[in-house]
UniProtKB/Swiss-Prot annotation:
It is found in: Plastid, Chloroplast thylakoid membrane. The keyword Methyltransferase does not apply. It comes from Capsicum annuum. One of its GO terms (cellular component) is photosystem II. One of its GO terms (molecular function) is metal ion binding. The chain crosses the membrane at residue 1. This is Cytochrome b559 subunit beta.
Amino acid sequence: SISAMQFIQR
């Protein structure tokens, strides 16, 4: 699964 930071930095 992905982290919140990974999702927003995308």
